[in-house]
């Protein structure tokens, strides 16, 4: 039971980090989190409980590392509120993936210009 409580607290902290400047979304995320806990409160088998705890921990990790809130500025651009735990990639995997996609990769139309054009 302590692992469930620990995962729940961890998820609550994750919602606070991810949605700290957006109170309606923070409240909605916490309502969703509580509902998920209630829905799984009837689990009896230890493997099912461990799987649910692992899933909750993964959700918390995803929220902290991958969710970035943005604010639209007066000039129409968005200011992104990154924090110290935000996962920042180097785009190398994206470049590799595009090369490996072969014929599935989209073709650039004549009306679409890239930064290199």
Curated annotation (Swiss-Prot):
Transmembrane stretches, start-end: none
GO cellular component term of the entry, any: mitochondrial matrix
Known partners and oligomeric status: Interacts with RIP1.
Record: transit peptide: 1-10
The protein's role, per its UniProt record: Assembly factor required for Rieske Fe-S protein RIP1 incorporation into the cytochrome b-c1 (CIII) complex. Functions as a chaperone, binding to this subunit within the mitochondrial matrix and stabilizing it prior to its translocation and insertion into the late CIII dimeric intermediate within the mitochondrial inner membrane. Modulates the mitochondrial matrix zinc pool.
Keyword tags: Chaperone, Mitochondrion, Transit peptide
Record keyword Chaperone present: yes
Cell compartment(s), UniProt: Mitochondrion matrix
Top-level taxon of the source organism: Eukaryota
Major site of localization recorded for this protein: mitochondrion
GO molecular function: protein folding chaperone
Designated name of the protein: Mitochondrial zinc maintenance protein 1, mitochondrial
Native source species: Candida albicans (strain SC5314 / ATCC MYA-2876) (Yeast)
Lineage: Eukaryota, Fungi, Dikarya, Ascomycota, Saccharomycotina
Family that this chain belongs to: Belongs to the complex I LYR family. MZM1 subfamily.
GO annotation terms (biological process): mitochondrial respiratory chain complex III assembly
Residue segments, region Disordered: 98-117
């Amino acid at each position: 039971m302590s692992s469930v409580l620990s995962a729940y607290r961890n998820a609550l902290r994750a919602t606070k980090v991810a949605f700290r400047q957006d109170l309606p979304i923070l409240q909605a995320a916490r309502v969703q989190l509580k509902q998920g806990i209630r829905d799984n409160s009837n689990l009896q088998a230890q493997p099912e409980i461990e799987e649910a705890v692992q899933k909750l921990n993964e959700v918390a990790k995803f929220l902290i590392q991958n969710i970035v809130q943005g604010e639209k500025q007066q000039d129409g651009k968005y200011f992104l509120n990154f924090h110290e735990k935000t996962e920042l990639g180097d785009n190398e995997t994206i470049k590799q993936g595009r090369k490996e996609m072969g014929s599935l990769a989209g073709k650039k139309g004549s009306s679409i210009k890239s930064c290199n054009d």
